[in-house]
């Protein structure tokens, strides 16, 4: 298979003409035989387990099931590359062509595309300037529509007629003294196709522009909506009747595979069942038309074909949902594309990337703001290439294979090397949805046990994260440039202000506020050890740790530094000893000075909780 490389700027989704759908699947063999049309509902032969010819897995249409081997087995080597077998018509090539070669089903009667009929808004109803309910009645054979009123005064173009009304008019037309002529009515997708073909887009657009100038309110809005749809058709070069399908594309077989299970049974994609329904009904309709079956039977088969194509394109959009085994709804083409688990969001936009991981977040209260706790199990996987490089560089192993063996054995030397590797190597944490630039920030990793990522509580508002089961993704910047940018621009400690408002986004909340309140609160009921004197702050904390005093007990602690407690205006109690030492007692302070007024000592009344709170802040400021 030749390597194809074609650059493009964007992918455009639009309407395809019947000719283009044919081109996707049609190929001409060297013997001038044209292949591409899928005519049989069979998939594989139950005895030979080979794909049936002209079926949904046909090798002539989609390519060989085995590399360099035709269906009948006449050609079986790479040396026969490009030859088309004279007996079976299969091209000798790689089997991977079955991932991109398409086929098509030629319908015995046209059907409407359910997206354009039942979408919101309905483009078909908007273009025809008819209520959606009326268009549905025509499509699903519940009402006739007048395509040409002829010379009948009682009829008008696009008027709906019931079965009884049409029979009555038919009787009048075929009566001997009838003056009626030129009347034409239709039903089903064929009638809708005819109505769409009658629309002259450019003329209609001009008329609408004139009408919009004179219209007001709701009518004007409706005209603008219709003009916008018509302008889009003109702009894209699409024709209105392409919304009615006469050819259906069949996607490549390897994208809807059939695989054999252990017990000899087969598991197959739901699409194969949906395609099979379409082919069966299409073949039955063609046979009924061939034998000139009664109109009512043909019409019923056309309606069933319409419903089968609707289910293939978007199962459940209209009517009863088609279900398979265990009453499970079959997954249609739309279901594969749309939603969070669809092809776009899951596989194209949300690809898994190398050097990334994902885990639940838990609070890391002992971390600094620019740090995150990275599980060892995750870190060794993310930084494996760096660890291997360092192991070889230090001469601990000779090659990559030996290094990987060492890592798999969880050798203790690995963790020392990993510590060296991650030092100064930031990682980026991202929490979906990333609604602003602070949804992804850089942190210095700290190795932790367990399997959860530890996060500093202060950065939670930026990520809009909480610890009730939220997950975050880790990404490793690889190049030196990426690492330096992460450290300088994305480090959490450099993103304190919100880029949207300019206000601080790093604000303590919940546990931090509660903890700060609890440490510094008054609690008259917990006063064990109250009134004791301590020589310094550390002594008071030590006494609390040894359970000599309660966290909220008021104690006296020596502190010779400046104190601002708002008590300078309060008149203290003054005692003077025989040696001239003056003791001044305030409600929260006791100061001793010698006869010259020099400070001997100062004791402040506080709690161990407040000492811990103050010491934590002072230590942070000092570092």
Swiss-Prot record:
Enzyme class per UniProt: transferase
Highest taxon of source: Bacteria
Gene Ontology process terms (BP): DNA-templated transcription
GO CC terms of this entry: DNA-directed RNA polymerase complex
Keywords: DNA-directed RNA polymerase, Magnesium, Metal-binding, Nucleotidyltransferase, Transcription, Transferase, Zinc
Keyword Zinc: yes
Binding of Mg(2+), residues: 466, 468, 470
Cofactor: Mg(2+); Zn(2+)
Documented EC number(s): 2.7.7.6
Details of cofactor binding: Binds 1 Mg(2+) ion per subunit.
InterPro entries linked: DNA-dir_RpoC1_gamma, DNA-dir_RpoC_beta_prime, RNA_pol_asu, RNA_pol_N, RNA_pol_Rpb1_1, RNA_pol_Rpb1_3, RNA_pol_Rpb1_3_sf, RNA_pol_Rpb1_clamp_domain
Function (record text): DNA-dependent RNA polymerase catalyzes the transcription of DNA into RNA using the four ribonucleoside triphosphates as substrates.
Family: Belongs to the RNA polymerase beta' chain family. RpoC1 subfamily.
Complexes and interactors: In cyanobacteria the RNAP catalytic core is composed of 2 alpha, 1 beta, 1 beta', 1 gamma and 1 omega subunit. When a sigma factor is associated with the core the holoenzyme is formed, which can initiate transcription.
Name of the protein this chain belongs to: DNA-directed RNA polymerase subunit gamma
């Amino acid at each position: 298979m030749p390597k194809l490389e074609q650059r493009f700027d964007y992918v455009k989704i639009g309407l395809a003409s019947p000719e283009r759908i044919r081109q996707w699947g049609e190929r001409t063999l060297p013997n001038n035989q044209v292949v591409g049309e899928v005519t049989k509902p069979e998939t594989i032969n139950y005895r030979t387990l080979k794909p049936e010819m002209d079926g949904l897995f046909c090798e002539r249409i989609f390519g060989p099931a085995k590399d360099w081997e035709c269906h009948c087995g006449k050609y079986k080597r790479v040396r026969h590359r490009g030859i088309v077998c004279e007996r079976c018509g299969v091209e000798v090539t790689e089997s991977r062509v079955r991932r991109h070669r398409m086929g098509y089903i030629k319908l015995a009667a046209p059907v409407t595309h359910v997206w354009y009929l039942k979408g919101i808004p309905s483009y078909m109803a908007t273009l025809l300037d008819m209520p959606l309910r009326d268009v549905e009645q025509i499509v699903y054979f519940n009402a006739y529509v007048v395509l040409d009123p002829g010379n009948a005064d009682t009829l008008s173009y696009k008027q709906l007629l019931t079965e009884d009304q049409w029979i009555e008019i038919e009787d009048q037309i075929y009566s001997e003294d009838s003056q009626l002529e030129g009347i034409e009515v239709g039903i089903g997708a064929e009638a809708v196709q005819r109505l769409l073909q009658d629309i002259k887009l450019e003329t209609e657009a001009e008329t609408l522009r004139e009408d919009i100038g004179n219209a007001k309110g709701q009518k004007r809005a409706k005209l603008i909506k219709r003009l916008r749809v018509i302008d889009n058709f003109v702009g894209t070069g699409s024709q209105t009747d392409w919304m009615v399908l006469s050819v259906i594309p069949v996607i490549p077989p390897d994208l809807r595979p059939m695989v054999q299970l252990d017990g000899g049974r087969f598991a197959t994609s739901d699409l194969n069942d949906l395609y099979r329904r379409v082919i069966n009904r299409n073949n039955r309709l063609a046979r009924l038309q061939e034998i000139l079956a009664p109109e009512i039977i043909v019409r019923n088969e056309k309606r069933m074909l319409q419903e089968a194509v609707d289910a293939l394109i978007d199962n459940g959009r209209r009517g009863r949902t088609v279900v398979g085994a265990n009453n499970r709804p079959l997954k249609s083409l739309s279901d594969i594309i749309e939603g969070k688990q669809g092809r776009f969001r899951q596989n194209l936009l949300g690809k898994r990337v190398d050097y990334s991981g994902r885990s639940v977040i838990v609070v890391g209260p002992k971390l600094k703001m620019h740090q995150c706790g990275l599980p060892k199990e995750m870190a060794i996987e993310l930084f494996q290439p760096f660890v291997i490089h360092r192991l070889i560089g230090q001469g601990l192993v000779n090659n990559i294979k030996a290094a990987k063996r060492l890592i798999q054995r969880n050798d203790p030397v690995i963790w020392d090397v990993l510590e060296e590797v991650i030092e100064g190597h930031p990682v980026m944490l991202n929490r979906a949805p990333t609604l602003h630039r602070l949804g992804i920030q850089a942190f210095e990793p700290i190795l932790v046990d367990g399997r959860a990522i530890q996060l500093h509580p202060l950065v939670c508002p930026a990520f809009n994260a909480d610890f009730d089961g939220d997950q975050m993704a880790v990404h490793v910047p690889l190049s030196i440039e990426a690492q330096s940018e992460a450290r300088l621009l994305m480090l959490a400690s450099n993103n304190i202000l919100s880029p949207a408002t300019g206000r601080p986004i790093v604000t303590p909340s919940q546990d931090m506020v509660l903890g700060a309140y609890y440490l510094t609160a008054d609690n008259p009921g917990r006063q064990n050890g109250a009134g004791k004197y301590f020589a310094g702050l550390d002594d008071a904390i030590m006494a609390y740790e040894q359970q000599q005093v309660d966290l909220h007990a008021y104690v006296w602690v020596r502190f010779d530094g400046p104190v601002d407690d708002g008590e300078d205006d309060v008149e203290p109690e003054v005692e003077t000893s025989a040696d001239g030492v003056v003791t001044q007692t305030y409600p929260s302070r006791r100061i001793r000075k010698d006869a010259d007024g020099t400070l001997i000592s100062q004791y402040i009344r506080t709690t161990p909780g407040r000492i811990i709170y103050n010491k934590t802040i002072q230590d942070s400021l000092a570092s």
